[in-house]
């Protein structure tokens, strides 16, 4: 059986449009994608970073594949992400995607990561990263199963 996938993210999405969009894709994923939400810290920028970093690292299971979502990470096209996702599925460990808050991820989280991925060079609100990631993981699953959701190449126009 494939180990579960998990998002560990700063911020609460309760009842938001972002949550509805996230659920739309997360519900289609196999293995299931679960979310652990970390409360957004308050205080100075340094204090926020320290507290959120500590909480994110504390939420990790002892053994897992850690994927940090960070602007400075490597951006993959959908086919390359599908290849990575297939490799992760072949492992007996759960995959944990780490998403920081408005201040991003600090170096200790990036150092703990096995992979650092980016959704591209643009900056995204941290609450939008979850639905974007869920959609890309669903797309990777569609590529792996030859589902028509993903259309290879660019549309002609």
Curated annotation (Swiss-Prot):
Upper taxonomic lineage: Bacteria, Pseudomonadati, Pseudomonadota, Alphaproteobacteria, Acetobacterales
Gene Ontology CC entries for this record: cytoplasm
Chain's gene name: rlmH
Assembly, per entry: Homodimer.
Protein name: Ribosomal RNA large subunit methyltransferase H
Group of enzyme by EC: transferase
InterPro entries hit by this protein: Alpha/beta_knot_MTases, RlmH-like, tRNA_m1G_MTases_N
GO molecular function: rRNA (pseudouridine-N3-)-methyltransferase activity
UniProt-annotated location(s): Cytoplasm
Species of the source: Granulibacter bethesdensis (strain ATCC BAA-1260 / CGDNIH1)
